[in-house]
Amino acid sequence: FAGEEEPVSLYIEKGEWAYEVRGDDDYDPNPEGRFKRGERGYAYLEVAGFDLGREDDFYFLRISVDVALETKNGFTLFSQKDVLELEEWYLEPPKNTWFYIYVNIPWWAPRGGYVAVITVRDLLAGTELVEKREVEVY
């Protein structure tokens, strides 16, 4: 019907492993997702499909992010809720937002393949998106 908006769903427009992140779309990609023990591993994400709140002449979003590391068999080695709590205010409705998270890979971490689980929660809509990506520690 004319005038009715389709409900939006939270989704990742861009999600990449990175060696370093400097800003919006300014990062050094790590396409293989391989990280050396004792170093910092980054994930760069651009997210869209979130709900917006409105107050006076401003639009705002509220997003939180959880992260976990699992074995390929699904055993959780590490998890942390709310590693990022994001509230941003805008004059115009944004198409997307970007952020990064990082993990310091312990020097003693066993070499091998793992699964990073990144959960993005839209606090205004009450929805969440779970993204699983393989990562290798060497």
Where are these regions (language model features)?
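Intrinsically disordered, low-complexity terminal regions enriched in Ser/Thr/Pro/Gly
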Residues: 1-138
